[in-house]
Amino acid sequence: MPALTVPPGVEGIVAMHELPDPAWESRWTRIVVADDIKERVLNFILFSLKQRARMDAVRLPIHGLIVLAGPPGTGKTTLAGGLADQAARTLGESVLFVEVNAHAFPSQMLGESQRSVARLFDRTLPDLARRGGPTIVLLDEVESLAVSRAGASLETNPVDVHRATDAVLAGVDQVARACPNVTFVATTNHSVGVDVAFLSRADLVEDIALPNVAAVEQILRDTLEPIVGSGLIHAALAPLARACVDAHLDARRVRKLVIRALASRRELALKPELLRIEDVAAALRAETKVTAAVPAETR
């Protein structure tokens, strides 16, 4: 199912999708995140979309906001999309998934960023919500949108950034009051950079950490099996997974190790089914060597 067309003149929205979509199902089924986290965020989404309108906002102050926090490459954005698709499947109805990215707003000069953010929350999202169906809004890299006002200096951050954060907070409050069929999922690589008032509005804050040994082993198996089939030696996965964890690889880098291994020899590029665990281990050694040569502040 192709992405929907973003209305002309709308700033901040990079894509819209009508879910469920068969192409999106793997974003939920293949993403390796702790089962309890997946269960909790799905249950909250279902509750927020279907029950929030019936709740007393003073007794149960639901903002309809989840924050997924963790290092880059841990699958937060993929999980958000898979969550929306799974919610649509569970509800048995269409869900509109709206992707908002702070970098899609115009230059943060002369108050334009604040006005654009205000328009998004005051006009664009309520207009989309009036469709009546469940709507899930992804606020990707929210640390660039709801910037911590306590940690930002006026020398390095224009006053407009502070005003834009105020606009986000007011907008989230407004949507929470007026649009109970809208739920936000925000992602952040640096939760310390997110304004504390935004985090306090979150109904759930979930830490998506680097994968442990069991998770890395599952990721490797999921990545390798379609390529090598019966040639995969499962007993060799555990030590490789341990080495990946020791190297502090995120889930995305683990999968990209397989790409590096396939690119290591012409034979493997043309016949990927010949790939073996030893090739991936060699790719890890090369990856670790390259990463170690890059100064930490530039990574």
Segments (PLM) and residue ranges:
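Short glycine-rich substrate-engagement loop in P-loop NTPases that contacts/grips substrate
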Residues: 96-130
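Conserved P-loop NTPase "ATPase switch" module shared by AAA+ and STAND
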Residues: 129-153
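Walker A/P-loop
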Residues: 62-98, 122-127
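A short helix-turn-beta junction within AAA+ P-loop NTPase domains corresponding to the substrate/partner-engaging
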Residues: 196-210
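Structural recognition of the conserved hydrophobic beta-strand(s) that form the central parallel beta-sheet
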Residues: 138-139, 166-170, 181-188
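C-terminal alpha-helical "lid" subdomain
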Residues: 1-30, 213-299
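Pre-Walker A (pre-P-loop) alpha-helix and adjacent loop at the N terminus of AAA/AAA+ ATPase modules
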Residues: 23-64, 126
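Substrate-gripping "pore-loop 1 plus following alpha2 helix"
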Residues: 116-120, 150-177
